[in-house]
């Protein structure tokens, strides 16, 4: 089916793709996205490797939090979830070149 030259070529392509993927993942780890909730009153800054860098809470929310702790918790969770969705979208967009031609099932996230 494949001669030695064909297999060697496939192996070289696979190795090159692996190196390119590693570089792309290293670059993505430096990219930051910001998730928000409450019209920007709570912000979560996260890298595309899911490391949270900052959480910013508007002073007005803190004043209300004394009376409504659950509201503050909900705002933080919503901002965090917004950041995660942005990380996934950014990662998918930047990694799409690697998935072309791989025939991955619909909904499969990459990198795995």
UniProtKB/Swiss-Prot annotation:
GO terms for cellular component: bacterial nucleoid; cytosol. InterPro entries: YbaB-like_sf (IPR036894), YbaB/EbfC (IPR004401). It is found in: Cytoplasm, Nucleoid. It comes from the Bacteria. The keyword Cytoplasm applies. GO terms for molecular function: DNA binding. Keywords: Cytoplasm, DNA-binding. SUPFAM superfamilies: YbaB-like. The keyword DNA-binding applies. Homodimer. HAMAP family: DNA_YbaB_EbfC (MF_00274). Belongs to the YbaB/EbfC family. Binds to DNA and alters its conformation. May be involved in regulation of gene expression, nucleoid organization and DNA protection. This is Nucleoid-associated protein CV_1611. It comes from Chromobacterium violaceum (strain ATCC 12472 / DSM 30191 / JCM 1249 / CCUG 213 / NBRC 12614 / NCIMB 9131 / NCTC 9757 / MK). The lineage of its organism: Bacteria, Pseudomonadati, Pseudomonadota, Betaproteobacteria, Neisseriales.
